Amino acid sequence: PEIVAAFETAKKPGAALHLMGLLSDGGVHSSNEHLYALVDAAVAAGVPRIMVHCFMDGRDVPPASGAGYMAELVDHLERAASKAPDGAPCEISIASVEGRYYAMDRDNRWERVERAYDAVVCAEPFRDLAAVAAMEASYGSEVTDEFVEPVALDARGMRDGDAVIFFNFRPD
């Protein structure tokens, strides 16, 4: 019922659905399949704007495997958007990318979490890059998945009236 309620909220004029969590098939904190199922369900429900915030792993999977996961996600999002019911508009974006070091800090280090928060909520810092290019730029700077610097790839940010689903399944 809560997921359906989030979809209904996101269908209101000007609203968006934000999906956030670890982009990994490591199976410890999340599953890519759960993310894909949420995207597909939101599209089928007629949610017109879906924004995905990718927390990169690098601990439960190899440290530079994120670009591959990102490419798979991009492919899935493109296919999903094309399946919107009755030709309804469906805009799906990868809105931010950040390493789990920032987005999933368990040690109360606000300076880390604040950087992820700014990328997710405020869309700062914004970079006009494709998601896979953002990962490749990180690798080019010798920064692996866990430590990817938080960056917004969609300038909209989060707004009052938006819906948020956090898809990690481990509580910490």
What would you call each of these model-derived segments?
Residues 1-172:
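…; additionally, a secondary subgroup of soluble metalloenzymes is captured
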